[in-house]
């Protein structure tokens, strides 16, 4: 009966997704508290805190040219699109130093991650004693990736410049770089 269908505040077509850890997950709590302790550190240019994340992104093109916009009208774009491949977006955020660095690569491999980390320590922070790095525990985010990409002495040199802290499983939202990538996607890339 249409009269019984009243407008309500339920929105089953909308979803907010959260990674909710199991209650009393000791490993989650330990990793979370470690990351939060890192975030409480005062700014120190000799030991900058840098958050790192990466995300895949689908490159799409228009199948047909969008119609010209008119004042007061929305842009009219065809719902059909052309796939132009994918890429990986790497982001480094130094929340206290105010530095943001984003790079785009064709893929996400152990070599790609290792090259980004070398850039971080050698180009972005060449004078820092150590870079305190916060990131998720993705399979390529391991010091072994540096050994896969570089000779052992070079990999070791890079590792000695890092102090790594991993966000907990189901807690990557604690990584400021992930938040920044999500904002960039919503405000820039998805437009």
Regions found by a protein language model. Give the residues of each.
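Mobile genetic element proteins and their domesticated derivatives, centered on retroelements
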Residues: 1, 51-53, 92, 98, ...
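Conserved short alpha-helical interface segments
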Residues: 1-22, 48, 54-58
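Extended, low-complexity cationic-aromatic segments
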Residues: 31-118
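Conserved nucleotide-binding/hydrolysis micro-motifs of P-loop NTPases
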Residues: 56-57, 96-97, 138-141, 170-173
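A short acidic (Asp/Glu
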Residues: 60-62, 142-148
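RNase H-like polynucleotidyl transferase catalytic core
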Residues: 75-81, 154-176, 191
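Active-site proximal helix-loop segment of RNase H-like, two-metal nucleases, encompassing DDE(D)
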Residues: 100, 169, 177-191
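Acidic/histidine-rich, metal-coordinating catalytic segments
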Residues: 128-141
């Amino acid at each position: 009966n249409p009269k019984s269908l009243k407008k309500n505040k339920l929105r089953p077509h909308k979803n907010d997704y959260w990674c909710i850890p199991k209650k009393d997950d000791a490993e989650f709590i330990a990793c979370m508290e470690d990351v939060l302790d890192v975030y409480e550190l005062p700014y120190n240019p000799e030991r900058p805190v840098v958050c790192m994340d990466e995300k895949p992104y689908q490159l799409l093109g228009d199948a047909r040219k969008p119609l010209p916009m008119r004042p007061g009208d929305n842009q009219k774009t065809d719902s059909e699109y052309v796939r132009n491949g994918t890429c990986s977006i790497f982001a480094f955020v130094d929340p206290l130093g105010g530095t943001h660095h984003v790079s785009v690569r064709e893929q996400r491999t152990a070599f790609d991650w290792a090259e980004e980390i070398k850039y971080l320590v050698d180009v972005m922070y060449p004078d820092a004693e150590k870079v305190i790095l916060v990131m998720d525990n993705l399979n390529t985010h391991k010091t072994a990736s540096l050994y896969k990409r570089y000779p052992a002495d070079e990999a070791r040199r890079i590792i000695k410049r890092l102090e790594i802290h991993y966000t907990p499983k189901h807690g990557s939202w604690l990584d400021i770089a992930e938040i920044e990538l999500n904002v960039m996607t919503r405000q820039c890339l998805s437009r």
